[in-house]
Amino acid sequence: MSVEGKNVDSYSGLTASVQHEHTHPVHNRGVALETTTQHAFITVASQLKPDLKGEDEEHNLELELHKFLSQHNHGPPSSGTTGTTLAGVPDFSASHNISHRDEMAEAIEKAMAEIACPELWNNDHSSAGATVGGDVHLDTLTMDGILGNEEPFVQVHEGALGSVDMDGQRYPHGRNSLSSIVGSKAIIQQSMDIHPTAQGGARSRQSTEEVGMHICATPNGKRKNAGVASSQATVKRSRLFYETISPESLSPLSDNSDFLKAMDTKGSGVQNVPISTSVTAGALGHGAKNIKGYQNASKINMASNIPKEKLQVHSTPPVVSILPEKLTQEFTMQQVMETKRRIINTHKLILNFNFLKESYTRSCSELKRTVFKLKESECHRARLAKENEQLKRLVIELNERMKNPSK
């Protein structure tokens, strides 16, 4: 072969290699990735401490190399190296692990948030839906609502309205009138402060509607209103406020009788609110004649069953304890006293826990001593049993010698 032929062959080989490089961009990316990973490997090896030796050093190098490889494999899509290995084969294992880790992290964060405050998540309570205060959103949380125990923290389910009326109809006065039956003391106080004339109107309306109230006779001879009885059951079902577990309620040594008595006297006024079961003609769909006929029939039934002395209904105004206003000195002192009481109860719990811990350690040490003494007694018993066997053999030998003295 001549020199000219060699030049032609070398030129054709160079052009073929260039065409191969242009036609195989995956190979070029693999070479570039290999060079970058090698450079990263060298820099990591130079930055390691000199005191790392043996397997720890190799393990750290492998971890760093895997980290850089995963970063290159899952880089931005513009780089053109997403999901490819050194050989150009797509790798889905690392991406699956990263997505799985992200899903696990989100699930763990959501579970921790639900454990901290489960009533703030509407996704879990939307299916149940029948509990009071179950659909509280994060956007509606305000400081006034949290401190005042207002809406939407006290929400009455619409199905609870059916148990208030005798005929199964919905209570026509709406949610605001039902808050005196179901709601908390703060809502009752707020309604009294906002509407000071509502009590007088309610009492006058009560005096006019006492004639149409259905009164049932109990076996003990006491009067009982059917609407009040059903409303008490409704109060028990829908009394779902935020009752947190405090150290005061868990402490076995804390004296909380005065506080509980005060709470009972405050909450007793909620059940004394009268309920009128007479409904307007538009709500029931009947005429005025039907209502008058129903009232006359109820009067006849009451007159035939109950004496006239027992038909007198005494209207008692609801007893509601007035709490101190917010951001005042009395309110602050009440909060300070409550905090002090909780601190004292927490210290009591800590002392009880320390006492139990000391008694547990003392019992453990005594148990160890008794086990050690038991082992010593077992060893001594085994030694005595061995000596007893030796003495038995010696007695047998001496008896044989006494029987045969010639030997």
Curated annotation (Swiss-Prot):
Q: What is its main location?
A: cytoplasm
Cellular component terms per the entry's GO annotation: cytoplasm; nucleus
Query: What keywords tag this UniProt record?
Result: Cytoplasm, Nucleus
Compartments reported by the entry = Cytoplasm; Nucleus
The record describes the protein's role as: Involved in cation homeostasis and in the regulation of the cation stress signaling cascades.
- Name the chain's protein: Protein ATC1/LIC4
State the organism named in the record: Eremothecium gossypii (strain ATCC 10895 / CBS 109.51 / FGSC 9923 / NRRL Y-1056)
